Every structure is written in structure tokens, then in C-alpha cells.
Amino acid sequence: MNNPNLNQENGTVGGWRLPGFFLVLAGIVLGQAVLYGPSLIGKKILLPLDILAQSGVYIPQTAEKPQAVLHDMIPTDLVYQFEPARQFAVSEIHQGRFPWWAPYQYGGVPFIWPKFSPFLLLECLAKSPGTLAWVQLIAALVTGTGMYFFCRKALSVGFWPATVCAWCFPLTAFFTLWQGFPTALAVYWLPWLFLAVDRTIRGTHPLAAPGLSVVTCLTLVSGHIDVAGQVLLGSGIYALWCWWRAHPGTWLDRKARTTLAMVMLGWGLGFLLAAPHLLPLLEYAQTGSRTMHRNAGIEERPPTGLQALPQVVLPDLYGTTEKNSAFIAPTPEKNLLESASAAYTGVLATLLVAPLAWYHRRFRAGNLFWIFLAIFGLSWCLNLPGFVPLLRLPVLRMMSHNRLLFLTSFAILALTANGLETLLVGGPIRRRWWFWLPTILLATLCGWCLYRSVVLPAAISTQADFDAFYLRKWGNILAAGDVHQVQAWFIRHYTIMAEFCIVGVIGWLGMWFQKPGRFRLFPLLAFFLVADLLQFDYGRSAQCDPALYYPDVPALKEIARFPPGRIIGGFPASLGFMQGLNDIRGYDSIDPARMVDVLKTTAAVPSTNLSYAETFLLAPRGKLLPPSGVGLPPVLDMLNVRYVIFRGVPPPFMHPPFQSADYWVLVNSNALPRAFVPLTVKTLATGQELKELASPQFNPADVALVTSDVELPARCRGTVQITNEIPTHIRIVAQMETPGLIVLADNWDKGWRAFWNGRPMPILRVDYTIRGVVVPAGTGTLEFIYRPASVVLGLWLAGLAAIVLLGWLAVIHLRSRQNQSPNQIATG
């Protein structure tokens, strides 16, 4: 987007020459080593395992193992959801199976963890969590080198501006705050995607469009699909800009139309290559509770307003949820990673270097686009008119738009690259009247931070005010902590932010008063740009003692030696899998609506209910049955919930069959086997099943509820037993005295196929959410095989796209050889 002839001074060390490129890599590695060094060398684990050591979570609380100090209460998903999912994927892959179906939650659901992600597949090479830090380093290298090549090829800046931006991009707040979450993985491909779009539209490389296909596929499969959609949305906006700039006034001519078609073809092939991931995910999402809520217009993260704007340059303005701090941001912000602070790219990059991009006229057209992209990324958080209604349109409202902030960060760094280029090769910097604008802004921010370090916010001015604030925001004053420690944290961080603002003011004054000549303080400026980000990043991600990594719980291990059955209670859903147990609850970001509806009918009144994870902490109604039993709602009997886990010490009148420190487990003797034959089958009109299931008189052994007519005797008799199973294949041996309905208490999903003695059979939705098959009298084998049509179609589409892509590459290769031949003849 800039003049490519500006690189003459830097070409001797940059580009593809190895010494220069190794310097790029070394800077990226050094930044990650500073942040995650203990985990990279194996002394720590890059997971917030201290969360597991909190009271009532997972690790037993005993006198020998007191409650650990909590680093941050927010990144619970890393240990509650994503690490159990990774371990399940590791288990399946190491047994030679691909992880399509997750039986450890909700009675079984499609496994939607981004299993095709190259980053997550690398994490699955070993069971050890030590791989997590190394994959984080690889991801940083991917996005950092992408930023380098984008700056060099698309922005046409020199080696050093591109290198500094490559060092900075993996350190920006979005990546740091979302470290470890699959949420951010698609964003690591953002520079490569923008570069592929730029090269395709400008037609500067024959492999650009095929490369766009590959990078589009990698973006779609690497992380969460909504963030991948936002990355592609940003690339679409950039494509329109590049197209408009490449074909000024000739947008309808043949060349312009061909260029646009090539971009669309590149994106289209990328979507087809990602079809095995996309199609099953979208199919499952249609059944999801959270999806239905978003379709209805319910917003989990509504816009904040202009009060969020200062966080872009003062990210710790409202504190954090980390230890010895408090998050006092205005409603509706609840934590730092979902706030505008995720756009932080460094106050020096934003207010010292980026404004210099406007110094030379040749940069200004491109700068207008980057300013627009930065505003677009902030639009949801700032509740900007015009943007927010657009982002609330169908399809777009399925995304969490507060996460568009990575576009703001990328745009600021693009402006920073232009600003650094101005300093290095743009000639002497002469005074401009507008230099005082960022200078005054930085001075104002500095003064405000110093003022706040003396006059603290009202919410933390006294212990009483702090307790009252915590009670309003979190409904609990017990976790508020000592206000003096919180005050010290705010004073320290306000002072640090003021110091960096002072550095920015000094930088502008230096440019105002400097003598004409070459800018000689570039190394110092580069140091401060990186240091600015490192001081924000350092210590944000918890790195914990390996001893905290899901230690064995004897009471839970003992369950595995007894009759199989699902569990409930004791700790957040999914953690049971780390002990080899399957929980009927779950949490997977989609949540199957029918299973959620059924489980909610069993919830005790004080049971915790999170709108985004309605069964995550669900505690069921029930009663203790001395000496060792427990009674549960009939629905849980139907769902094979055999073991109920409690914490602490049992009452004197109970003698649990399984007990260890802080854990005791009771057996629900009324739990049905996972496969059974109900005595009768009752047909109901659609919509009446939940009412019947919620009745205390419902007996799942006596009656099964269906919504379609079946021809069966008044009373069905037979015995069934599961003889063999893996997550995607279940074999049941049946001896039926009469025709009957074999019920499998697993979640119904359209991807399953049933075969009775090898003959395909229809699968009925039974009892609102589980599955059943009508079989004739006699002895036979019923097999359930998970073979979703969406996966089969996705594999065919991906194969077709791969063939087209390979053919395309072959044509490019042949044309390249044909073009070389005449040149060789002429040379000869």
C-alpha cells in the first residue's frame, strides 16, 4: 500500500536473507520466553491449575493441602473445559481413532473442540501438558512472521519497522488475555490472510490465490468459528479496500472482475477445505441452547459505551480480576479479557509512533483505511451508532463482537509500521503543528494517572466501600479481600501507566526540538515499544506447579471398579473425565438444548444457574437414604446417573460406599442401565414430553415416551446388555421375548445410525432427548454407529476442493515453466 522503493537502506539485511529473518524469529522467541519461560523449561504448567485448588472445585481441601492462592478467577474454561477436551482428543488419537463424539458429557455430544486445528493437533502429540507452552511459542512464531511479511510485502516498509511490528504483534493484549483459549487461535492467521488477500488482488504472485484458500481453511479450523468469521469479515473489508485502490475508476472492467473472482474462489475453496469441520459444527449448533438464545436476540456481552475508550491506551484503568486487584469497570464489562483492554497495543505505539504515519502524504490514503478498521474493531465496545445495528443483523449477531478488538490492534500496528518507516527513511522529521495533539493527550493521561494514584476510585477508597462494591457486582463480600492490597495494586499500575505516558511526551518533545538529521534513537524506541507490551503481559497467565495437575482422587478412582454409570455433583461438569468418569452435565459452548431442558427439570432451587452454561454447576434435587443411598428425580434414573458426588464430611447417619479426603459418593440404586427395555411405550403430542418427564410419578422403567406411532404389544419384555463400545460404535446384545423398544440413554443426534443384525433401523427420539430402536422378538445384535452425513459430505467437499487446488497449482507450475523456456532459449 506504500511505495516499495523506500527499502533501499534495509534491503541489505532484511527480506529473505537468513541473518535478518533469524533476528525476526529470535525477537519473537525472546518475548515468549520472558512471558512463559518457566513453562517452556518444564518447571511450571501453562494452565491456571490454582483454580482446581480452590474450595469445592476439585483438589481435596485438607489440613495438609490448604487452599492455594488464586491468581485469577476468570480463565476457568482452560481447566474446566479445554484441558479435559484435549485429554479426550489425545486418548482417541493415540488409540488410532479420530475424536468425533464426546461421551463424557451430556450423555454424549458431537466433539466440537477444534480438532482439525494445527495448533491443537500439535498439543495432542503428547499427553503431557508441557506441550501447551511450546505450542503457544509456535503460534506466536506463526503470527509474528505473518506480521513481518505483511509489513514487508503489503505495507512495503523496511526491514526494521517490519521486524519491530513482528516482535510486538504476538505480545498485544488480545493474544495475552486469551492465551490458551481456542477462541484466539483463528486470529494467529490474520496477518497471513490479509497478505494473501493483498497479493491476490494486486496480482503480484501466481500462488497468492491458492495461498488464500489454504489460509482461509486454516483460519476456519484453528479455533472458535465465530472468531474465525470475524477474522474473515476483517479480511473482506480489507479486500474491498485493496480492490478499490488497485482498480480506481475501473471497478467494472474485466480485469477488476477477474481479480474479485479470484478472491472469491480463494475464499470458497478455503471454506470447502474446512467443510469436515464446519458442517458437523453448524449442524450441532442448530440444536444448541446458546445458539437459540442468540438467534432470539439475547446478548451475552452487550455494548459498553464510550467509557470503555480509555482502556485502549490505559488497559489497567479499571483493574483486573487477578489477585490483589479488583475489576471496577462500568457495567456490563465483567472481566478484562472481554473488555476494550484487549485492544491494547501499547500506549507508545498508539500515541507516539502510529501518529507519525500521517507525516508523509504517500501514507495517508492507506492510513484512512487503518483508522476505519480500528474504529470498526472498537465499534461494539463503544456502542457506536451505525455499527452496532449492523452487527446485530442475522448471522452477525451469532458472534461476540467485543472480540473484534484484534482488528483494532492489527490496524494500530499497521500505522505503527508506517510511523517507524517515516522515522527511518522518510528524511528529517520537521515540526508539524499537530505534533502537539498527541503530546497534550499523553500529558493529560499522565496527569490523570498520577492523580488517580493519589485519589483512588471511590469503589476502593475504604474497606466498607470495597465490600459494598463487591456485594453489588458479585453478590458476595467474602471474596473481596483486603482493600489495602487492592489499593497498592492500583497505585502501582497507575504509576506505571503514567511513566509510559511520560516517555511518550518526551518522545514528542524530542522530535519537536531535535536538530535536522537522521533519527538515531530507533533501537531505544524499539526497546520501549516491546517493553510497553511486556510490562502489561508479564504475569497475566498463570503458570502453576505440576503437582496441581488433576491429582487422583481415591474415592473417584474406586468408582471405576464398580458397575458403570454416570455421575453428577461434586465439582464443575467435565472434570470427572480426568478421573475416567462421565458426567450427565456438561459445558461445550453450544449445549444441546433438549438435554439442557431435561436436566433443568431436576435442578434444586439453590442450584447455580449460569446463562451461558446452564448445567455447568447444576445440583439436582434429591434425598439421602441412609445408610448409603440417595434418591434422585426419575429423569436422572432414566439417564443412568448412578453415582452422586458430595464434598466435605458426610453426616453421621450416612456411610458412603466410596470416601476419601473431602469426597464422599452415594449410589443411586434406582438408576437404570444405560441400555434397557421399557415395559410400555406411550405416544404423546410434540411438546408434552417435558411435563410428563418432570412428574414425580414418571417411571422410566415402566414407560417410554415417543412422539411417533409405534406398533408394539401392550407389554414388552426383553433383556439387553452393552457388550462392546467405543465413542462412535456401541454394540448391544438383546434377547427379546416380544417385540419392543430398546432404549439407549445417550443423547439423540441425527448423526447416529442403527443396525439390527446388520439391517438398518430408524432411531426414535425417546423421552424427549435420548434414543431408541424398535426391534422384533428374538435374539440379535443392535449396533449404533456414529456416521453423520455432514461429516461424509464435508470430507467429499474437502476432497473435491483439494483436487481443484492441486489442479490449479499444476496449471500455475506448467505456465511458469512455459514462461521460463523462451527466456532460456533467448539466453542461449
Describe the residue ranges of each PLM region:
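Contiguous transmembrane helix-bundle modules in multi-pass membrane proteins
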Residues: M1-N3, Q8, F21, V164-A166, ...
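Hydrophobic alpha-helical membrane-insertion signals
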Residues: W16-G107, L282-S289, Y538-S541, D545-Y550, ...
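Transmembrane-helix signature of membrane-embedded glycosylation machinery that interfaces
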Residues: L30, M147-S156, V197, I201, ...
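Active-site lumenal/periplasmic loops and adjacent helix-entry segments of GT-C-fold
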Residues: S39-A154, W160-W189, Q307-A340, A754
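Periplasmic/ER-lumenal interhelical loops and adjacent helix-loop junctions
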Residues: L52-V79, E83-Q87, S91, R97, ...
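Extracytoplasmic
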Residues: Q54-S55, I59-P60, H293-P302, V486-Y494, ...
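Selective detector of the "anchor" transmembrane alpha-helix that sits immediately C-terminal
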Residues: K127-L155, S341-R361, M497-M511, V791-S816
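Active-site-proximal, structured, solvent-exposed surfaces of multi-pass membrane proteins
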Residues: S574, R585, R642, P651-P652, ...
